[in-house]
């Protein structure tokens, strides 16, 4: 299938049809940058989906963290069930980069733990981009980090079709070059096995499907897709494309050329260090690099091989590394979600990485070429990005400058809900007034969100409200993911009436039951009380038809003035639209997606076990590995029903871990 097809009971409504038309008109007129100013609850994701369907272009959606990326991925997958919706984020559950602290003469080795499920999804994403056009890839900012060359990745692909001739030994050798491992006993992702005239391949982009190649001599007769757990045949395939088990696969000739390049740079660097009278650094660099060269010669790989990536990709010093952007077709479309956060994040990535590696190079731990194993500079990202739509309720200065301040607004909500009423009250005696407002709000059956400036104040306020017998909880940065979701569940169900936080009541926290957002010390100018922060926080009350926001301030700051004026402007537009179309605003309850994932876990594990697993990534990985072994053991004992149950539990845990990462 080459066309995008939305499967949904909803049609564009409110501002959505106009916004979709305007963005598409801008794309058609070759505008490189546009802004979709979408307020909370206006249906930004659904609007993006309709733009994708109508333009029918491969799309990359960038989000500023894994959690937001997972939410968008889940929503897009439900909207486009017949198309390729993929997920591309960092595959590390844990990552400690190598570093050297000169002050204490401490070298920290690289240490990491790779999430197999996310690695699988990364392979599925690059594969889809090379195989088809109806592709949406939802990514975190990790898409600007170095990836294997798309040219080599595609060049080394093995294309299999029934009726063609494939010399057996050559095919097995090709699979090994693709970094597939022969394993006739334990058959898992990234492996192949040989049984008589059959070769079974477990592709790197599947978790529950494998391919069986049936040969007559050297002729490939059939390709069957089968369940690797039960052995049941699922489908007969007309062709199969086997891509590398790593994005860094390369032919032997490339490895040989790289080794020559590394040796040449090593000699130049050693001469330089000697001229600087640095015997320790000279000896250290020579020893470490010679060991890596020996490993590359013998195995084609070495620990930290990514630090030599420039030699494998054929790039010159200082040139940008290949990234996911090079896998995108020329006519691809880019959405940058919550761009007011994502764009500064992209800008910051290069400098932090560079500072750490310069120290390693200076002290003889790495060759200067290691500096080219890096994320894209902001200027490079700016050059590589295709036509872009920046999506935010509060666009940043870069986006506004790129578009000349022109925005496409999504202000009318399909539900008819208005932006909340904003009330400014004196900060003097703010707690006393807050308690009165809390009583009024709770009496209506609504919940209250309170945002403070400091952790100490949040803790003290929570304790004080609890003393007054209010059902109060405190949300802060040290709350683990699972506990955070539990708190949100308790808030929505009424177990908690009041939630106190600092900077956690902004993007992505949608509570329809919230009738009041109280912003304490709103006149203290700064990051937490900037125009952007205030507008985002005000938006938390926009899911409720009776939602109100109280800003406690003794003076009117520029940020308060702009935030309240903008909210009032939007509210008036919404009121006029509702009056014209006879719409009565109504609160719509919506399940928090991550909450649904938590319920899934809860049904499989007891609460204590769930907390233990999700508070400790290492224990979660161990538990998943244990389940895999139990599943394979059950299958080998022909206990397929038990194996299927374990597989379902395993899938639930892996999906939940992805959602909650």
Curated annotation (Swiss-Prot):
Which parts of the sequence belong to the UVR domain? Answer: 621-656
Q: Which UniProt keywords apply?
A: ATP-binding, Cytoplasm, DNA damage, DNA excision, DNA repair, Excision nuclease, Helicase, Hydrolase, Nucleotide-binding, SOS response
- In this protein, which residues make up the domain named Helicase C-terminal? 430-592
Binding locations of ATP? 38-45
User: What protein family does this chain belong to?
Assistant: Belongs to the UvrB family.
> What is the name of this protein?
UvrABC system protein B
Q: How the protein assembles, per its UniProt entry? A: Forms a heterotetramer with UvrA during the search for lesions. Interacts with UvrC in an incision complex.
Among the Pfam families in the record, one is ResIII
InterPro entries, from UniProt?
Helicase/UvrB_N, Helicase_ATP-bd, Helicase_C-like, P-loop_NTPase, UVR_dom, UVR_dom_sf, UvrB, UvrB_inter
Name one molecular function that GO assigns to this entry.
Answer: ATP binding
Q: Which residues form the Helicase ATP-binding domain?
A: 25-182
**Compartments, as annotated in UniProt:** Cytoplasm
- Map motif Beta-hairpin onto the chain: 91-114
Q: What does this protein do?
A: The UvrABC repair system catalyzes the recognition and processing of DNA lesions. A damage recognition complex composed of 2 UvrA and 2 UvrB subunits scans DNA for abnormalities. Upon binding of the UvrA(2)B(2) complex to a putative damaged site, the DNA wraps around one UvrB monomer. DNA wrap is dependent on ATP binding by UvrB and probably causes local melting of the DNA helix, facilitating insertion of UvrB beta-hairpin between the DNA strands. Then UvrB probes one DNA strand for the presence of a lesion.
């Amino acid at each position: 299938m080459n066309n995008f097809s939305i499967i949904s009971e909803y049609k564009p409504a409110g501002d959505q049809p106009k916004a979709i038309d305007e963005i598409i008109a801008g794309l058609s007129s070759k505008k490189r940058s546009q802004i979709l100013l979408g307020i909370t609850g206006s249906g930004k994701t659904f609007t993006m989906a309709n733009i994708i369907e109508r333009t029918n272009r491969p799309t990359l959606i960038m989000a500023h963290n894994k959690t937001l990326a997972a939410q968008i991925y889940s929503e897009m997958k439900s909207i486009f069930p017949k198309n390729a919706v993929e997920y591309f984020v960092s595959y590390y559950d844990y990552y400690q980069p190598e570093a050297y602290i000169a002050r204490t003469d401490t070298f920290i080795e690289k240490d990491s733990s790779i999430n197999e499920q996310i690695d699988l999804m990364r392979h599925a994403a690059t594969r889809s981009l090379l195989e088809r056009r109806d592709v949406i890839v939802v990514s975190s900012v990790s898409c600007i980090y170095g990836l294997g060359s798309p040219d080599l990745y595609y060049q080394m692909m093995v294309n299999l079709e029934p009726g063609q001739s494939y010399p057996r030994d050559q095919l097995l050798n090709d699979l090994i070059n693709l970094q597939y491992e022969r394993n006739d006993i334990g058959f898992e992702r990234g492996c192949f096995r040989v049984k008589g005239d059959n070769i079974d391949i477990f592709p790197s982009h599947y978790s529950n499907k494998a391919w069986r190649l049936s040969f007559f001599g050297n002729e490939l007769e059939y390709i069957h897709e089968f369940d690797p757990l039960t052995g049941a045949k699922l489908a007969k395939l007309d062709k199969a494309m086997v891509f590398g088990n790593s994005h860094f696969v390369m032919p032997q000739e490339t490895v040989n050329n790289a080794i020559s390049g590394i040796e040449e740079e090593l000699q130049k660097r050693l001469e330089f260090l000697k001229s600087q009278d640095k015997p320790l650094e000279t000896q250290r660099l020579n020893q470490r690099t010679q060991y890596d060269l020996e490993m590359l010669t013998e195995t084609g790989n070495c620990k930290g091989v990514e630090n030599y990536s420039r030699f494998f990709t054929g790039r010159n010093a200082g040139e940008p590394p290949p990234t996911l952007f090079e896998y995108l077709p020329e006519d691809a479309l880019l959405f940058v979600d919550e761009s007011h956060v994502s764009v500064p994040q992209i800008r910051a990535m290069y400098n932090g990485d560079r500072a750490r590696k310069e120290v390693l190079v200076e002290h003889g731990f790495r060759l200067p070429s290691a500096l080219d194993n890096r994320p894209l500079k902001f200027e490079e990202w700016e050059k590589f990005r295709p036509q872009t739509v920046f999506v935010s309720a509060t666009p940043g200065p870069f986006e506004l400058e790129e578009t000349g301040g022109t925005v496409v607004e999504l202000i009318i909500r399909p539900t008819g809900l208005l932006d909340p009423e904003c009330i400014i009250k004196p900060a003097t005696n703010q707690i006393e007034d807050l308690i009165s407002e809390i009583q009024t709000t709770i009496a209506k059956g609504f919940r209250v969100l309170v945002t403070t400036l400091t952790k100490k104040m949040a803790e003290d306020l929570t304790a004080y409200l609890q003393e007054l017998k209010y059902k109060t909880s405190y949300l802060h940065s040290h709350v683990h993911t699972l506990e955070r979701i539990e708190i949100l569940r308790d808030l929505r169900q009424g177990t908690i009436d009041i939630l106190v936080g600092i900077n956690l009541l902004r993007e992505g926290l949608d509570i329809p039951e919230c009738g009041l957002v109280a912003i304490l010390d709103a006149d203290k100018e700064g990051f937490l009380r900037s125009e952007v922060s205030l507008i985002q926080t005000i938006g938390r009350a926009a899911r409720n038809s009776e939602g109100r926001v109280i800003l406690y301030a003794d003076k009117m700051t520029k940020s308060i003035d702009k935030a309240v004026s903008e909210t009032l402007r939007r509210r008036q537009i919404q009121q006029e639209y509702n009056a014209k179309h006879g719409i009565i605003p109504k609160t719509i309850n919506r399940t928090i997606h991550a909450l649904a994932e938590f319920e899934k876990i809860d049904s499989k594990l007891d609460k204590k076990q769930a907390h233990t697993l999700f508070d400790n990534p290492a224990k979660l990985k161990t538990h998943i590995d244990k389940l895999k072994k139990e599943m394979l053991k059950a299958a080998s004992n022909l206990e397929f029903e038990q194996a299927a149950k374990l597989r379902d539990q395993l899938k639930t845990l892996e999906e939940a871990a992805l959602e909650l990462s």
